[in-house]
Amino acid sequence: PHAAVDALERLLPSRDSVILDMGCGTGLVGELLHNLGYHHIDGLDLSPEMLEKAKARRIYRTLGEADLTASVTLDPVYDAVICVGVFSHHRSQPFDLVKLFAGLKPGAALVATVNGKGWRDIDWETLLEQSRREHGFNVENISDIPYLTQQDIPGKLLVIRPNPS
């Protein structure tokens, strides 16, 4: 998560920024952000059990359940969305990520990680390009990052901005 948090910090120097931690899990990313001085963090996750653990950290403004493969309703209130450990082997994911754009203020960015094995196995880069052409967004950065280091699986870090409407 550190590479994604570092990227988000470079994009958002203001600690007053409002951030959505999509797929917040137990709250590890939120805690890293909180420790850097960000205090306006909301979290969404698929698992009620994970959300309970995130709630116990007492760092999120709000927490809620959301499934990115279903419909996700977001208001455009976020300066950034960070999504760590969510994207991997599912061919719909490069298309699902555009659902998060609804939560972004104009000019805001999505910072996401992708499991490197999934990136390779389903040819994420090609699918991401198809999604970009279909939905209109700018991939500002794709970089290699450590991911599941104990399993020796690398990852990708993406910085994406929707095109202005």
Model-based region annotation:
Residues 107-115:
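Conserved beta-strand signature within the Rossmann-like core of class I S-adenosyl-L-methionine
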Residues 80-93:
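A short SAM/SAH-binding and catalytic strip from SAM-dependent methyltransferases
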Residues 95-106:
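A short glycine-rich, Lys/Arg-flanked "PGG" loop and its adjoining helix->strand segment in the class I
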Residues 72-81:
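A short acidic, Gly/Pro-enriched loop at the edge of an enzyme's catalytic core
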Residues 148-165:
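Core SAM-dependent methyltransferase catalytic element
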